[in-house]
Amino acid sequence: MIEYMYRDTDAIEVIKISKDDEYGDVQRAVEKTDGRLLVIGHQFYPGKQAELSQDKNCWEFFYEQIQVPYDVRYNYFKVERDPKEEERVFNKLNPNNEPYIFIHEDAARGFLLERDHFLDRGLKVIENDVTENIFHFTKILEDAQEIHCMESSFKTLIDFYCEQDNIFYHDIRESQPLGQNSSPKWSVITYD
């Protein structure tokens, strides 16, 4: 997925880290950098929980960690789209071309969105298909009648590509608010 995202530039080298030897792979990659390494991540969260509860999202912390202005996120984002693959995924998940709701949740980790928040419960529901490249969902996202999602890569993609009304952020992960610098088009649904 990461290689796909950066396939149009030679300036970025993507290094695969195996699950079998994660520590060793990372150590070898670090040794090849000659000290030119930019570290961004969750390990810098300690003490930030109060800020997370005040509507700051994880991506905002990442930008702050490396002192990059938030607007860089929107002004320089680009992914070379693949219309054929987007159409293939669209046809796979919506073969009858019905109006639909797109939903992104993470049932495997217990993050289930409450369907009673759907505006039109009669619409077909299309869920994330983990066998497909997230970037091939762009047409599905753009054409959805409603979108419901939690904090995820899909939420980020929706931030960039979706202009329609009826886009809902389900705040089901207490440590992941929408964020102060996300697109204003989101309606937030909070969970107790």
Regions found by a protein language model. Give the residues of each.
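Catalytic machinery of carbohydrate-active enzymes
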Residues: 1-192
